[in-house]
């Protein structure tokens, strides 16, 4: 064997040993693989479509968010889009709860029927972004008058055209906050927080969507367009401020990495790769492209699974530069969640009769140490037009299912 071949063999062995060691070092990989999936928010074209107790139904469901409360109950939120799948018009903020704090959403029958957080008038309510704070659940959401839309010119059911969102009080996008202190059973009337938590003169706005976090030091952090919203003070009685982030995206995720720092992982502007910045409540560094996380300019979701060894941060998005149907869940073992080297495609656990899975997502850690994920799916009846129905899938899987993926 020549010296070059010998050196090459050493490199190959070293790389193989490192990869093998990384897998072996996580004891979760030795457990039996588990996954389960089913449609949770059923669109109007599906058998037994979801409707409110009033009988009101929805063409489509989009923009999911999920959290586990202090009791262990799971709350799943979504936008109920009345007439089509688009971002404008009559959209209600709806949700489901698990029937008990202990069933973890194992089966479709474990959930209560569809309820409404808010849907006042023909307005556009959405971008659910909950955060659990002791016995209080804060739910941030966005709202605009139904006569307006982001770019204007959209046709409403009565034939009128929407106006373009502008910086006037009536025409701008508003930030609202509602709370629950009974495990999501009831919600307070939403309070408009726009004047204190949205930059002056900003017309369009988006909070989350997804979820906020509670830091190890006690503060709450909620991602929003161009900023973080910070909750200080005692649990359930927070005072709120905003932290402006230069270069932040229109839709952001937030997590506290195992090293105690904060990481924003944002939707990129053009299609390509995720935009990431790290920092603290005192300030963030610049956003930079993460070339290891391809993204088709869509929302993603992130979850701090645990901070003790082996520390794990979970990330989910469509791992493609140009399509939303390449959904993948990944694990990072880095203290700063720098690299997500292990992952698995969701299509490895296919689900029939739900359309084409992919798009927005949200994750939570369930009481039985599984990962619960809500993922959008598009029926694509008119090739992505406004008539294509959208539903939302609920997935449960364990760490072993990710770790033992065929591409690891």
Curated annotation (Swiss-Prot):
GO molecular function, one term: exo-alpha-sialidase activity
Signal peptide positions (record): 1-22
A single Gene Ontology CC term: cytoplasm
Binding, substrate: 62, 81, 87, 150, 267, 324-325, 333-334, 339, 360, 378-380
Cross-referenced InterPro entries: Sialidase, Sialidase_fam, Sialidase_sf
Entry's Gene Ontology BP terms: ganglioside catabolic process; oligosaccharide catabolic process
Catalytic activity reported: Hydrolysis of alpha-(2->3)-, alpha-(2->6)-, alpha-(2->8)- glycosidic linkages of terminal sialic acid residues in oligosaccharides, glycoproteins, glycolipids, colominic acid and synthetic substrates
Family statement drawn from the similarity comment of this UniProt entry: Belongs to the glycosyl hydrolase 33 family.
Its biological purpose: Sialidase is able to release sialic acid from a wide variety of natural substrates.
PANTHER family: EXO-ALPHA-SIALIDASE, SIALIDASE
Protein name as annotated: Exo-alpha-sialidase ARB_03431
Naturally occurring in which organism (per UniProt): Arthroderma benhamiae (strain ATCC MYA-4681 / CBS 112371)
């Amino acid at each position: 064997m020549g010296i070059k071949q010998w050196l090459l063999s050493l490199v190959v062995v070293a790389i193989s040993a490192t990869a093998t060691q990384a897998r072996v070092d996580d004891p979760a990989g030795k457990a039996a693989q588990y996954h389960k999936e089913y449609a949770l928010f059923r669109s109007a074209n599906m058998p037994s479509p979801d409707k409110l107790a009033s009988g009101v139904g929805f063409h489509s469901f989009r923009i999911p968010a999920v959290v586990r409360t202090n009791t262990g109950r799971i709350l799943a939120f979504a936008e109920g889009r009345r007439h089509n799948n688009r971002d404008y018009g009559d959209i209600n903020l709806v949700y489901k709860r698990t029937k008990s704090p202990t069933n973890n959403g194992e089966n479709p029958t474990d959930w209560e029927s569809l309820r409404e957080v808010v849907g006042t008038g023909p307005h556009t309510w959405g971008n659910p972004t909950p955060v659990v704070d002791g016995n209080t659940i804060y739910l941030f959401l966005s709202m605009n008058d139904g006569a307006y839309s982001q770019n204007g010119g959209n046709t409403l059911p009565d034939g009128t055209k929407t106006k373009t969102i502008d910086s006037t009080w009536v025409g701008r996008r508003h930030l609202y906050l509602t709370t629950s202190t009974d495990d999501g059973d009831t919600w307070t009337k939403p309070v408009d927080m726009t004047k204190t938590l949205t930059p002056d003169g900003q017309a369009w706005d988006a909070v989350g969507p997804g979820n906020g976090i509670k830091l190890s030091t006690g503060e709450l952090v909620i991602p929003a367009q161009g900023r973080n919203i910070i909750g200080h003070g005692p649990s359930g009685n927070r005072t709120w401020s905003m932290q402006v982030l230069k270069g932040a995206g229109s839709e952001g995720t937030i997590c506290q990495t195992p090293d105690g720092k904060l990481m924003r992982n944002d939707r990129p502007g053009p299609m390509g790769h995720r935009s990431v910045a790290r920092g603290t409540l005192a300030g963030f560094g610049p956003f930079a492209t993460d070339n290891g996380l391809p993204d088709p300019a869509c929302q993603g979701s992130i979850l701090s699974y645990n901070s003790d060894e082996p520390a794990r941060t979970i990330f989910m998005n469509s791992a493609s530069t140009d399509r939303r149907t390449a959904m993948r869940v990944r694990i990072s073992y880095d203290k700063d969640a720098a690299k997500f080297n292990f992952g698995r495609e969701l299509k490895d656990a296919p689900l029939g009769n739900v359309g084409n899975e992919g798009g927005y997502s949200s994750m939570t850690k369930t009481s039985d140490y599984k990962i619960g994920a809500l993922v959008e799916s598009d029926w694509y009846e008119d090739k992505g037009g406004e008539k294509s129905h959208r539903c939302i899938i609920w997935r449960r899987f364990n760490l072993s299912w990710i770790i033992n993926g065929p591409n690891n």
